[in-house]
Structure formats: structure tokens, C-alpha cells
Amino acid sequence: MSATDLDMEGFARLVAAAPQSSWQARILRLAPGDSNRFTAFCREQRIVQSDTIERQLADLAQARLPAASPAERDQFVADAVAAAGDAVAVGAWAYLPWQATVVHLLDRDAYFELITNRNRDKITQAEQERLRTKRVGVLGLSVGGESAVTVAQEHLCGEIVLADFDRLDLSNLNRLQAGVDELGLRKTTIVARRIARIDPYLTVTVFEDGVTSSNLGTFLAGLDLLIEECDGLLIKHEVRLQARALGVNVVYAGDERGFLSVEPYAHWPTLRPFHGLVETPPLPRERYPTSIAFMKALTEWLGGWSNISERSQRSLACVGETLCGYPQLASEARYAAGQIGHVARRLLLGERLHPFVGNLDLAKYLPVEDAC
């Protein structure tokens, strides 16, 4: 039992005090004989109980004993319940306060074993255990939010650190995996909740006011990898200077023509920040004379104005006049997250990747046939 896990009394105190705006799952461990009291308490507090523990045990039996007969798997389930002394005491319960729901789950190690089972052997068990020791930071939670969830879902780390100061607006729903019931919430809250619903045991740390020069060192401390996806040009530049000094690898993907940057500072300590493409510190946004001037500066982080698509160029020329912001699509955000997941997995497993900056542009590989 972890020091932060709750018993029945601790759970009751938490429910009485915890705000429903929380993003953190809490782990509850019940003792044999707690069932009636627990059920009555949840009913009184209008907390939904979700209990599929026998189905999870059967799933675990199939993963561990793929050649076993149905009777042998049934015996595996019965033995697990008997060993706990009571079905309610098998494993643990995860309390999701924002959903007023408590979910019965396998214990931490069995949960990890089962949720990563279908990764095998694209990721081996030994690799998965190694990844479990890693700490990954994600700065900026638009494309970064999808990347964070991808990293969590593949279990590429044991702790993930999320940073963004922004809140969800309706116009974000064209690309972010969120719902209308989450409008106005912090993006850190939304992403942390998504991760908690996938794996409530995964350690999540949140910088809900984002990252600035004053807390950048704290954010980077102990990271094995930084996924950089923020919009602030100054912090994009500064974070690379500090990451290089600390030997922290940086990966960044833009939702524009499959743009990808891999900056493996751990093995390439003399690599210039962002491959030397942005040599001088950018100006603060308010110092740019026009919207298009700022947008052109932003495209330096996508390989330059000439490197973005014609449609994006036309759109950016209208920002501040007929359009309010940079065009972004859900499919491109998901594609970027997939690229980041691939690179993150290889870097975190110790592969000595070469620096890379360029486009993995699907339009290039799927050209339009010329008309006859």
C-alpha cells in the first residue's frame, strides 16, 4: 500500500473535503468486510461504483495463461478472490472526483502488466519496465496534449509533467480531444484527467500556470525527455538553451506538413538549439508590428515561411483581418502526436538518434494525379 493510498476512513474524509474540480485520481484500498459500508457510503454520497474486477482478472488470466482452458482461467479468478479474502478487497479502487465515480481495478503491478500486454513485443516486458522509470515533460497542451496522452497510453514513462497556462475555448474543439462540458477548464486539467482515466496509477505533475523563465529550471529538473509544443517564442528558445545545458533530449512536432524536430542533446551536447534555425532570441509577441510579422516569426519554428503549405500561407496572410489565428486540423495534431510517440519511445530506450529536422509530409507521398 502506497503512502498516498486511502483506507475507508481516509476515503470518507477525502469525499467530504475534495473539490469536484480536481484532476487527480486517488487510490483506495478496502479490507475484507468493507463491502456493505462502502456501498452504503457511495449511495449516500451519490458516487457511482464501477466494478468489473472479475472481468479484469479473467483478462489477466488470459494474458498470463494464453494456452489454459476456460476452467483453469476460472480457477485463477477464484483463487485471486480467495487470496484477498473478499472480492471488494481485490486490487484497489480508483476515485475520480470530477466524475463522482469509483472504479475497481487490479493492483498497481497487475494493472501495469495487463495494460501493457498488447504492446508486446513491439515493446518488450524488459523495455516496458525500463520505461516505467522515466520522467517526461510536456510543454504546451494542444498538439502536446495529444502527445502526452499517447506517451501515457503506451506507458513510455512512470511520471509525466504537464505545463500550460491556457484554458479550453470552443474554437479549440476543432482539434483537441475534449468536450463541451470542459469549456473553460485548464488544459492541464483536461489532459491530466484523460491520463487518469487510462491509468490512475501513473504519476502526473501539473504546472497549471505554465512555464516561465522563473520556473523553467524546476520544470526541467529530472526530466529524461522534453516534448516542446508551446506557442511562446521566447520560451521555445530559452527552454532549448537550458535543456541542452542539462543534457535533456527535446522533440517537437508541428501540425503542419508533418514537421518534426529531434534534438538529442544527451548525446549531441554541441548541437545548436533548434538546429541553428532560430539563432537569436525571438521578440515578445507585442513587439511585432503586425499579426503577419508575428506569424512569419512563428513559421521559423516550422522550417520557415516557404516550408509551410500554400493553404497555410494564404490563411496566415489573413490573420488579424478575416481570420483570428493559425489554422490547425485534428488529423494533423494526431499525426504529430504519433510522430512524437515514436521518437520518444526510441530516445527513452537509449537509442542514439541523430539530430533531425524536416517534414514527413503525407501530401508528398500521396500526390494528386495530373488530369488527362
PLM feature spans:
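Buried hydrophobic packing segments
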Residues: S147, V151, V191, A337-R345
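Glycine-rich adenosine-cofactor-binding loop
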Residues: E127-D169
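E1/E1-like adenylate-forming module used to activate ubiquitin-like modifiers
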Residues: S2-A82, G222-S331, Y335, D361-C372
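Glycine-rich phosphate-binding loop and adjoining beta1-alpha1-beta2 segment
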Residues: L162-D199
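A structured beta-alpha segment of the ubiquitous adenosine-cofactor-binding alpha/beta core
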Residues: T188-D224, C230-H237
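A short, basic/flexible loop-to-alpha-helix module at the beginning of a structural domain
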Residues: V102-V136
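Oxidoreductase and adenylate-handling cofactor-binding alpha/beta cores
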Residues: H267, R272, Y335-H354
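N-terminal, Lys/Arg-enriched amphipathic/low-complexity engagement segments
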Residues: E72-E113
